[in-house]
Regions:
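Flexible "arm" and connector segments at domain edges
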Residues: 1-100
Length: 100
């Protein structure tokens, strides 16, 4: 595997800094998926507002919040993959691109 790009490393460091500040809350794996989805929507809205009205630093901060919630969802889905294997996916990439 190649080394992550400098920008990715810097972004991940910002993600980790924010996560570390909230370690006392016990992580995200216990959070229900609907809560994570709604929280991601809220963070995206905050990012959109920041893009219009806030400083670059605030925009970057909101982008990190969005990324952290995306990572939470990714991690929760990864941990439930075995439970979800039998599910039928609608509009999968394969169906959309004619590779069924």
């Amino acid at each position: 595997m190649t080394e992550p790009r400098v920008e990715l490393q810097q972004f991940a460091e910002h993600m980790e800094r924010k996560l570390t500040k909230r370690d006392a809350y016990g992580g995200w794996r216990h959070l229900p998926l609907p809560y994570l989805k709604e929280s991601l929507k809220n963070e995206i809205n905050e990012l959109l507002v920041a893009l219009e009205y806030e400083s670059p630093g605030e925009v970057m901060d909101e982008a990190v919040d969005c990324a952290n919630f995306c990572m939470f969802i990714w991690d929760v889905m990864r941990s439930t993959t075995d439970e979800r294997k039998g599910l039928v996916r609608r509009n999968s990439k394969e169906e959309v691109h004619g590779k069924s």
